[in-house]
Design a protein with these regions (language model features):
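Acidic catalytic motifs of isoprenoid enzymes
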Residues: 1-172
Length: 172
């Protein structure tokens, strides 16, 4: 239905803006401070403090029509902030928190729009985290060029493998 489609467009656009803010730093088109300001603009949009933003009416309608919790939007923003400030994760728990925020939060937003019976939030979270972990594994080389290592450092250490070996693409 058009209302659900428009709500998904709004969530996608919000998510894209958050991700683009971080990507702009990685592409040297913005400073971390400028990217942080863009994320704060998204927070202002959620608070209803950005009425001139063309996305504002769509986000407001999505939240009101489908009862989408603001917390899921906020978690997504926090995930993007983690990307701005963290280049590496020490533990899987830290990485899981990032995956939850960067990906599972989007799934949790979407299930509110799709509608459901029962409580699929556990499955939406697991799917979002699994998709983000898959993305991390797929992009290991690309992330290394950006100085990022998403693989938990404690796991590298546990298997006798160093970040330096990973950066040199050494296999052992």
């Amino acid at each position: 239905p058009p209302s659900r489609r428009n709500a998904i467009y709004a969530v996608y656009t919000f998510s894209r803006r958050a991700d683009d803010a971080v990507d702009s730093v990685e592409e040297l088109q913005a400073t971390p401070e400028e990217a942080g300001a863009k994320l704060e603009q998204l927070r202002a949009l959620l608070r209803g403090e950005a009425p001139s933003d063309p996305l504002a009416p769509a986000i407001e309608d999505t939240i009101e029509r489908f009862g989408v919790p603001l917390e899921h939007f906020e978690e997504l923003i926090r995930g993007m902030e983690m990307d701005l400030h963290n280049q590496r994760y020490q533990t899987f728990e830290e990485l899981y928190r990032y995956c939850y925020r960067a990906a599972a939060a989007v799934g949790l937003l979407c299930i509110e729009i799709f509608g459901y019976q029962g409580d699929p939030s556990e499955h939406a979270e697991a799917l979002g985290v699994a998709m983000q972990l898959t993305n991390i594994l797929r992009d290991i080389s690309e992330d290394l060029t950006r100085g990022r290592i998403y693989l938990p450092l404690e796991d590298l250490d546990r298997f006798g493998y160093s970040p330096e070996e990973l950066e040199r693409n050494e296999l052992n």
